[in-house]
């Protein structure tokens, strides 16, 4: 899924377009390049909403619950999650039964983050495993080793 970020307005679109072109014959790989501030998917009994995260996170469950595009599947799902990024550090909480997970950043510290004192966050990637009936059943983290 493609999301425009506040740091990158065009590069991610071109990367997604290039990857979609490269994998065009692979039916198991899909690319969502639609311009939207929110996106969602359903995996079994779990609704997963996606948002950049540059907002008040506690408002996100209501945003998805009232969205014309996602309110139906949001309401029918047994489990509900919203995944965000933006803040470049990991955080997870539950708001009104919806798990909100802010993903860690893969990127290092650039000048803007350093000047703003947004430093020392653990760089990592998460792999989340879902079961059709039981929702999220596992989470794996791979930390990025820093070169000094």
Model-assigned labels for residue ranges:
Residues 18-37, 42-43, 47-147:
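Conserved beta-sheet core of the metallophosphoesterase superfamily
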Residues 7-10, 14:
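Extended amphipathic alpha-helical segments with heptad-repeat/coiled-coil character used for oligomerization
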């Amino acid at each position: 899924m493609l999301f425009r970020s506040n740091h990158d307005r065009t590069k991610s679109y071109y990367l997604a377009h290039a990857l979609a072109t490269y994998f065009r014959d692979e039916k198991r790989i899909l690319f969502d390049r639609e311009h939207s501030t929110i996106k969602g998917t359903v995996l079994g009994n779990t609704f997963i909403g996606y948002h950049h995260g540059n907002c008040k996170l506690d408002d996100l469950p209501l945003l998805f619950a009232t969205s014309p595009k996602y309110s139906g599947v949001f309401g029918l799902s047994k489990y509900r999650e919203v995944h965000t990024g933006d803040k470049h550090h990991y955080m997870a909480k539950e708001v009104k039964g919806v798990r909100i997970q802010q993903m860690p950043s893969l990127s290092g510290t650039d000048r803007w983050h350093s000047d703003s004192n947004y430093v020392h966050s653990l760089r990592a990637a998460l792999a989340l495993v879902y079961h059709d009936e039981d929702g999220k059943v596992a989470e794996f983290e791979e930390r990025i080793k820093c070169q000094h």
